[in-house]
């Protein structure tokens, strides 16, 4: 409808439910996405792609690809919807856990999640070694990539909701309630929220951005 070629791959999911995607190690998922982006660039003849992702798909997964796997050379824009950037738990809890448990216990926690092929759930906790590796060593953004983070204050997974935002150069952080104060979208609601959709479309083509028409949505607000 808008003239974009849209690709939506599912990788690294549960072995018995492969369409339940991206539950495995985020590093492995990022490598799969890297290969897929290369295929898209070859098929379309484009030099770069725009990435739109929700939750893990807007936060640690694409950011790992961009910062660790050379994605900054192939990504023009990253539009992140309710991304789990700084963890899905309060920072105070993460700080307490970091100060309270040993590295050996950290490793044991990682191994337990990895064995069940749900490593990404542990990796998105604010106190995880993965989160510290990715976000704890200076800026995660890269020159040449335009970042937009769209988050709402009623997110019930990324808590507090400010964990989603990146306070770094080149990032536009948008709070849904600034233009649409009566939008009560939860974390899952972001995947079909009409107001969020409008903001994402504007981020894709900022030169032709349109005013957001706030829509009241039953069961969301």
Describe each region flagged by the PLM:
Residues 27-134:
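Serine-dependent carboxylesterase/thioesterase catalytic core
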